[in-house]
Amino acid sequence: MIKRYTRPEMGRIWSDENKFRMWLAVEIAATETLAEAGLVPREAARAIRELGDFDVERIQSIEAEVKHDVIAFTTAVAEKVGPQSRWLHFGLTSNDVVDTAQALLLRDASRLILDDLRQLQQVLRRRAFEFQDTPMIGRTHGIHAEPITFGLKLANWFSEISRNLERFERAAEEMRVGKLSGAVGNGAHLDPELEEKICERLGLQTASVSSQVIQRDRHAYYVATLALIASSLDKIATEIRHLQRTEVREAEEYFSEQQKGSSAMPHKRNPVTSEQISGLARVVRSNAQAAFENVALWHERDISHSSVERVILPDSTILVDYLLAKTTALIDTLVVYPERMLRNLESTGGLVFSGQLLLDLAEAGMLREDAYRVVQSNAMRAWNEDLPFRELVMKDKEITSHMQRGQIERAFDLKRQLRNVDKIFARVFKDSEPQARHVEARPGRAHKTPAKASR
């Protein structure tokens, strides 16, 4: 992945230096375990641990000649170890090292992503409670539907990210597996009990059965889960892009004093972070398809998956780490306009209460079909002639013959529409930390925002 989208710690994990360091960790663990079993001289295991090292450039130089990265690695390490290097890689095949080390790399990458998910959870929780009672219009098919609160929208995102966290914990655990079962998985050169001890030494579980490689359904599940996370972030970003549209302007990305939106149009304040999130999410989703293609390998293994994984595993984890950090900052600094939300909600003159009026008329004794007809008739007139729906309803004799003015007014009561938001919040956040309503932004994170805006 290009440096532009790589955060330092995740980039370090996927560096060549760290990859080879993990390979060496597997080699050392294997040699020491074999030494404890009396299969390798203890002085050899000690020499490999104490002298085992490598130079990345030397490995690359050897690989250019031998055309095999693991042989290049073991050759470079052997040069450092000396005579005892004859016990290096004893009883192992290349993918015993590569797959087991890859599990270690993914374990470390997963820890960062899990931390990222928890941080996003916390920010979504805080902002959800901040806007728990901030009314706005809910939209279906892009059209005004019924009132919600902005906090309810944030609670939805919190719940989805929580599910992603649970899914990713399972996927990460499924990838925490090593194998040292040899070239075809039959354990011919290394007893399965020793294989388990080596994996345990590395903090990994042992694949119960494998071929030359750990089976790639695990990797497909892992990358698919990353793609789901990216898709959820895309969903959040897409919503913010809509809310920032000039015609809507209910929320927008924080825009710093020195920021520029366009080289040609000085007035522009574009949702560039949200657009970046949506764009990079497409890359992660496309990687999931490649991961699925890797499941069907020939017989006990071919190498068609290897080149793919050199791209999709680092890139997918790097991108999701980046996307989660970007989304967390986006939500944390999001500028919200409660007055604009209320104005947009009221812009249709009460049309968004048609569903409640329909129910109230049915409860008052009108047949549902008749109630639907009379409410829709007034709604379409309000829509087509740009008239206030509420006033039309008040003048409709068919409606007033079933409902008194106070009853009609109650159908247009915004608080009535939102009366169960507290119960929904209690259900969503029942297992999370208690929150006070309208929590302020964390100290030191406040930003100057436009007038009549809430961040």
What residues fall within each predicted segment?
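Short, well-ordered beta-strand elements within core beta-sheets of diverse protein domains
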Residues: 152, 220-228, 356-364
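Conserved hydrophobic residue
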Residues: 40, 45, 248-249, 367
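Amphipathic alpha-helices that form helix-helix packing interfaces
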Residues: 30-33, 113, 117-120, 124-127, ...
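A short, charged helix-loop
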Residues: 197-213
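Alpha-helical support elements that line or immediately flank enzyme active sites
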Residues: 31-32, 105-117, 226-235, 240, ...
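Glycine-rich cofactor/substrate-binding loops
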Residues: 1-22, 26, 62-66, 83, ...
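Glycine-rich anion/phosphate-binding loop at the beta-strand->alpha-helix junction
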Residues: 164, 212-305, 310
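A helix-coil-helix interface module used to build multimeric assemblies
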Residues: 1-187, 191-197, 206, 259-262, ...
